[in-house]
From Swiss-Prot:
The gene is PABPC5. It is found in: Cytoplasm. Keywords: Cytoplasm, Repeat, RNA-binding. This is Polyadenylate-binding protein 5. Binds the poly(A) tail of mRNA. May be involved in cytoplasmic regulatory processes of mRNA metabolism. Can probably bind to cytoplasmic RNA sequences other than poly(A) in vivo. It comes from Macaca mulatta. PANTHER family: RNA BINDING PROTEIN (PTHR24012). GO terms for molecular function: mRNA 3'-UTR binding; poly(A) binding; poly(U) RNA binding. Gene3D superfamilies: 3.30.70.330. One of its GO terms (cellular component) is nucleus. InterPro entries: Nucleotide-bd_a/b_plait_sf, PABP_1234, PABP_RRM1, RBD_domain_sf, RRM2_I_PABPs, RRM_dom, RRM_dom_euk. Residues 18-96, 106-182, 199-276, 302-378 form the RRM domain.
Length: 382
């Protein structure tokens, strides 16, 4: 329980502007220590150290609620980065409504900071441009990691800071200051950039007789290549896919446009921009999330669909092929008059298992045919 007078629930809004967030606290700091530290600034209603709900260990931050907003403002302006237990703490206005923080409006990102610039220096460097809701130099055990975030209470203040500070030299280092971007936005920009510059091409559903030389012959007409490789298993057998790296993006793009969907020796090629595994998994996750949001409730199972099944594959064999990726609740080959129709479904217990199966099994030859494996639409019953 915090020190001082408790905050009556019915009067919460009245004291909203008199509450301060206190961050970067030493684990040994208590409510009483906070109370004694801030009491000289003015009458307090209560102090609170936030703790883990299970272990009750302190989380490194807390709140100080003053009786009067003027006292809270005085403390914010004069006590920020003071010491408790030998460690400087950060102060900012308490923001119970986190919509502004989550919106990203007014938030900026700073990188290439000198290690000597701490939270205090950052605050005073940027406070000239507007009211700061929060500022934080990101650190690890070795100190500053060279980047930071400053959140202003308005977009105009953030734009002023970017205009005046981007490219400025601080302690002989030229800093970058720009608008904060959420991870999803940064990833989208990387994807857009990669699509406009890629030189590495992924090719799948190639025949067993296609080796590096034959693959090069097929792709070299579009431009000079740096490397061509058919991927093989431990026994030397082709896995049915490979990579072609061109010297220029234009050649790679032309090859994709011309060869994707083309039939070679009865096999329809897939030709596209080569993606890193983490990018493929992220794309699968995004697609799954879009499908999941269409459902009213979370389904108990995650289906994947398999096409181009060999005629010899039955339910048992299908489950066996996919069992290494996780817990399977259902594996079914679609039948017609006792004959497999060439496609089936496998239901996993989690999205992670299903995603891994798609990533590893799509294009793999099982029996005599390369599989076409995709995430299915989540349903109430799998």
């Amino acid at each position: 329980m915090g020190s001082g007078e408790p905050n009556p629930a019915g009067k919460k809004k009245k004291y909203l502007k008199a509450a301060l967030y206190v961050g970067d606290l030493d684990p040994d700091v208590t409510e009483d220590m906070l109370y004694k530290k801030f009491r000289p600034a003015g009458p307090l209603r209560f102090t609170r150290i936030c703790r883990d709900p299970v272990t009750r260990s302190p989380l490194g931050y807390g709140y100080v609620n003053f009786r009067f907003p003027a006292d809270a403002e005085w403390a914010l302006n004069t006590m920020n980065f003071d010491l408790i237990n030998g460690k400087p703490f950060r102060l900012m206005w308490s923001q119970p409504d986190d919509r502004l923080r989550k919106s990203g409006v007014g938030n900026i990102f700073i990188k290439n900071l000198d290690k000597s610039i701490d939270n205090r220096a950052l605050f005073y460097l940027f406070s000239a441009f507007g009211n700061i809701l929060s500022c934080k130099v990101v650190c690890d055990d070795n100190g500053s990691k060279g980047y930071a975030y400053v959140h202003f209470d308005s977009l105009a203040a953030a734009n002023r800071a970017i205009w005046h500070m981007n490219g400025v030299r601080l302690n002989n280092r030229q800093v970058y200051v720009g608008r904060f971007k959420f991870p999803e936005e940064r990833a989208a920009e990387v994807r857009t950039r990669d699509r406009a510059t890629f030189t590495n091409v992924f090719v799948k559903n190639i025949g067993d007789d296609i080796d590096d030389e034959k693959l090069k012959e097929l792709f070299c007409e579009y431009g000079p290549t740096e490397s061509v490789k058919v991927i093989r298993d431990a026994s030397g057998k082709s896995k049915g896919f490979g990579f072609v790296r061109y010297e220029t993006h234009e050649a790679a793009q032309k090859a994709v446009l011309d060869l994707h969907g083309k039939s070679i020796d009865g096999k329809v090629l897939y030709v596209g921009r080569a993606q890193k595994k983490i990018e493929r998994l992220a794309e699968l996750r995004r697609r799954f999330e879009r499908l999941r949001l269409k459902e009213k409730s979370r389904p108990p199972g995650v289906p994947i669909y398999i096409k181009n099944l060999d005629e010899t594959i039955n339910d048992e064999k299908l489950k066996e092929e996919f069992s290494s990726f996780g817990s399977i609740s259902r594996a079914k080959v679609m039948m017609e008059v006792g004959q497999g129709k060439g496609f089936g479904v496998v239901c996993f217990s989690s999205f992670e298992e299903a995603t891994k199966a798609v990533d590893e099994m799509n294009g793999r030859v099982v029996g005599s045919k390369p599989l076409h494996v995709t995430l299915g639409q989540a349903r109430r019953r799998c």
